[in-house]
Amino acid sequence: MIKRLRGLLVMLCCVAGMAVAEEKNILVTSGSDRATPIAVVPFGLQGGSVLPEDIADIIGNDLRNSGYYSPIPRQNMISQPSQASEVIFRDWKALGAQYVMVGSIVPSGGRLQVQYALFNVATEQQVLTGSVAGSTDQLRDMAHYIADQSFEKLTGIKGAFSTRMLYVTAERFSTNNTRYTLQRSDYDGARAVTLLQSREPILSPRFAPDGKRIAYVSFEQKRPRIFVQNIDTGRREQVTNFEGLNGAPAWSPDGSRLAFVLSKDGNPDIYVMNVASRQISRVTAGPGINTEPFWGKDGNTLYFTSDRGGKPQIYKQSVSGGGAERVTFVGNYNANPKLSADEKTLVMIHRQQGFTNFKVAAQDLQRGSVKILSETSLDESPTVAPNGTMLIYATRQQGRGVLMLVSLNGRVRLPLPTAQGEVREPSWSPYLN
């Protein structure tokens, strides 16, 4: 069984004897230029207390994860100023830093006041200054906020470090005793909280565009059904109860509709439901498996995986009618489509002709070229940050399911800290502020 047709092919075997896809475009396997050196100096703390989180470390990691910046190691810092007036620019020029951030933390009345300033080292000019306040429990929130502000000021791209992630863990205690847990965490895997536990599989969690609701597939009734749950209240509703497969939910950009896969009429096909009225309409038809829908920003186009041509490839089709158009031509396997924020890049699970490994790849939709982003194999379930700079995917390392973060420019690849057990099915939230 090929597992990459996530959600659907967990339950169905792939069709055998598939024809080889035609190679039409270019494959790029490596290469990227150097990230911009930046120094995020440890923030000064008044009062001599010890905080549970290192705010400067979190900011530096955020900027690194974007693939745009390379933080200078603390042990290399010649000086460690905490105020703008203490910055000696020759120290940072000697280290090759293009930017330096300093900051201070002042406890006051049970809260923390965090001040920060960012400088261009070459011009010796301040490019950003600000302050943010919160409790000790909000240190990570404040750090992500400062990283968001800094990233947007330097790049013009809205930061996505204050976003969240969904994922599923599976802990097997014995042959017939596995616990599945739906978790929500910071985008970097920190501060995980449990949203749902079940003795039956949970698949395909997806944030609604408002960030307040999620959709997912649950087997708690011994068959797949789609649920919608309010994150804050925990209230949940079953929204599908059709015979056969109910899988791969995907929210429309305005949150009013869900696309998903049903097999009630025979082959697995894509349908769209009005969430308020529960009315459904069929989008795809014909032979083969059609699955893994993903909405375009226009709210009318669906990208999806289909094996109608022999092997899994990605197609797009209007929900209002018309035929499907094939999108991918490089490789003999392309599945699980996701679009970048500007819709210029298609992220997918890709297998090259003549290889057996499944990789995360990005296709330039204008030129058709494909770039391999991951260095792992058996990759699945890519999910893209709302600003299109990073992605998270599931893979296997040392016999265990794990999550990996990759920058879309290919400069950063790192594992994310998660709970014990098999970790899978990541889904990135929209902007939450």
Curated annotation (Swiss-Prot):
It comes from the Bacteria. One of its GO terms (biological process) is cell division. It is found in: Periplasm. The keyword Metal-binding does not apply. Its main location: periplasm. Keywords: Cell cycle, Cell division, Periplasm, Signal. The Tol-Pal system is composed of five core proteins: the inner membrane proteins TolA, TolQ and TolR, the periplasmic protein TolB and the outer membrane protein Pal. They form a network linking the inner and outer membranes and the peptidoglycan layer. Part of the Tol-Pal system, which plays a role in outer membrane invagination during cell division and is important for maintaining outer membrane integrity. HAMAP family: TolB. This is Tol-Pal system protein TolB. It comes from Pseudomonas putida (strain ATCC 47054 / DSM 6125 / CFBP 8728 / NCIMB 11950 / KT2440). The gene is tolB.
